[in-house]
From Swiss-Prot:
One of its GO terms (biological process) is lactate metabolic process. SUPFAM superfamilies: NagB/RpiA/CoA transferase-like. Belongs to the LutC/YkgG family. It holds the Pfam family LUD_dom. It comes from Geobacillus kaustophilus (strain HTA426). PANTHER family: LACTATE UTILIZATION PROTEIN C. This is Lactate utilization protein C.
Length: 240
């Protein structure tokens, strides 16, 4: 990802300083130490197993299927969930974690041999990736950070993982390594801030997805699937 350019920043800051009646401050500015930070107390002290219990209960409230499995059984669990959602076509990002978790054979050999179409996102194909996402019945991706409190998967978009994978297919499956589960948005924001503080680049698009697409009118009549997948499942890998 290339760095962007900031235009007219100095002029903008000088204008603000002028309106405040002082000269621009070029040094000595630090982040304040807040006296109260209650956001860190929510689910504080919870073990990873405790957080999984919170996540599982929340999935029941957000109409999301929750499955626990191990690395050794992941391929079978994924196969069963895709079948439960009606089979392919399937779209996935070009993510090395699929190989690390033993899913390459399923994606590249087994499903194609069964006439289940699998599209692996390829930035060189451009618009064809979006067309494949529109035609897909199931989108599958790994969660980068998982928020137990809200049942949210956090996904960092990149060239090999377009956001269309998460929003255009009829159904969606997130593979959730247990180690990615944190209490809430507070910890996810801290991870992103830490990357920035270290001089790293963060994705231009970070998606926070909480179950299937939900919409409601003023009378709170819930409609599922208007703006994205109609069904969603989280497959938690308990030994990763």
């Amino acid at each position: 990802m290339t760095r962007g350019a900031i235009h007219n920043r100095d002029a903008f800051l000088e204008h603000i300083a002028h309106r405040l009646g002082r000269a621009p401050r070029l040094s000595g500015v630090s982040r304040p130490q807040w006296s109260n930070q209650p956001q860190w107390k929510v689910l504080a002290g919870y073990s990873q197993d405790d957080l999984l219990n919170v996540l599982q209960k929340q999935c029941g409230l957000i109409h999301t299927d929750y499955i626990e499995t191990t690395s050794a059984e992941l391929a079978g669990a994924l196969r069963r969930q895709v079948a439960a959602y009606g089979g392919g076509p399937v779209i996935v990002p070009d993510d090395p974690r699929f190989a690390e978790y033993g899913l390459s054979a399923l994606l590249r050999d087994e499903w194609p041999a069964e006439q289940t179409t699998v599209h692996i996102w390829n930035p060189a194909l451009g618009r064809q990736n979006i067309d494949a996402a529109e035609q897909a019945n199931v989108g599958i991706a790994f969660s980068d950070i998982t928020l137990a409190e809200s049942g949210t998967v956090v996904l960092f978009s990149r060239n090999e993982q377009g956001r269309a994978i998460h929003f255009l297919p009829k159904t969606y499956i997130a593979i959730v390594p247990k180690s990615t589960v944190v209490p809430r948005m507070t910890q996810a924001a801290a991870v992103i801030h830490e990357q920035i503080e270290k001089g790293g680049l963060v994705p231009s698009c970070i998606n926070f997805i909480t179950g299937p697409s939900n919409s409601a009118d003023i009378e709170m009549n819930l409609v599922v699937g208007v703006h994205g997948p109609m069904k969603a499942a989280y497959i938690v890998v308990t030994d990763r």
